[in-house]
């Protein structure tokens, strides 16, 4: 009878219905799918939440009159109505194709107590009453749409209620007399309650749920460099079996948001129904993240002597590099070296069935550090490597880990003559494995956050890798505490 912004459907709608318009292309970077199983769980939780909320509902007073033989017309008023107990025995939340959601409650019971007053000219009488309302049935259709601002709009498109039976017992002075006309009073009580049920529901959606949805953010912070845009690209798509909600799913720079030059791919989602909720995350989300961190210089690195282990026989100076570049020690005796590396372009993560991979192309330039603090370039290298990736799906985010392949080094330019590329490959492999990749993996371990609100917990996760996207399935638990 009453919805509340604290109940699971409100939280679920808040998670799913966060609209903005104007994305590049028509394809989302993230899709959330709710199955029948998920909707059944929502209906069960809503029933428990409503049962708790009903005890706090203020029912309206109502009045009327009855004609009593020898007394004439008697005006009565029922007030101070309180719900003493309620049993909501059945509920269902179903999809309305191309519209939204249908929520129903059936075969429910409420017991109400309160006070009554009777007025007949100078006659003033009062007492208490007890009402048992049986066989309550409520049917509500929710229309899901969007505002011009891009945020969600939820409205009650239809509402109906029916009460099978009302039993009124009146006590107090002349209560026995009013009980003689309980049929009239019960009929009046039924009509008032049936009209108020839908009024309360519509008011709750309009004054509580809709304003709540308007306050929902459409972006979230990942770290000081990046944020996630999980605004929706259109109205949720309801079919008879599932509800698909399309998010933009773009990682953006928090300092300087720039347009992305590529589009999200089409995701052909499998027909899976064993979990309550599924998340389909395209390579668009991960590759926009790669753009952000590449542009911020996060993938750049510098190798100096202080990052070489103290017990290493190879130091970052011209004496040690004599094995790679024989002339360098003669041209710059006892001089420290610095290697500056940068990934040429943002690595692109490739999804294929059961496999994740990427390729990185780096450029490394070496400088000798002269006594006057001048850095003089001496050689330039091109470095290529293939990397496999592993992903883990936990209760709130996706984390990653890179497993690097062997690097390939090519000499692009040398100002110090002949070069032993193979030996330098071994040195660079050591550094990348022990410094560069651990830094990247630490960042990947922080994870890609899923668009969840507080009190929503995921469990029994599964992860599948398909062409161009990840497909994650999970069950949902609403935490009451």
Swiss-Prot record:
It is found in: Secreted; Cytoplasmic granule membrane. Disulfide bonds join 159-198. GO terms for cellular component: extracellular space; membrane. Gene3D superfamilies: Bactericidal permeability-increasing protein, domain 1, Bactericidal permeability-increasing protein, domain 2. Keywords: Antibiotic, Antimicrobial, Disulfide bond, Glycoprotein, Immunity, Innate immunity, Lipid transport, Membrane, Secreted, Signal, Transport. SUPFAM superfamilies: Bactericidal permeability-increasing protein, BPI (SSF55394). GO terms for biological process: acute-phase response; cellular response to lipopolysaccharide; defense response to Gram-negative bacterium; defense response to Gram-positive bacterium; innate immune response; lipid transport; lipopolysaccharide-mediated signaling pathway; macrophage activation involved in immune response. Residues 1-25 form the signal peptide. GO terms for molecular function: lipopolysaccharide binding. Glycans are attached at residues 300, 355, 386, 394. Plays a role in the innate immune response. Binds to the lipid A moiety of bacterial lipopolysaccharides (LPS), a glycolipid present in the outer membrane of all Gram-negative bacteria. Acts as an affinity enhancer for CD14, facilitating its association with LPS. Promotes the release of cytokines in response to bacterial lipopolysaccharide. Belongs to the BPI/LBP/Plunc superfamily. BPI/LBP family. When bound to LPS, interacts (via C-terminus) with soluble and membrane-bound CD14. This is Lipopolysaccharide-binding protein. It comes from Bos taurus.
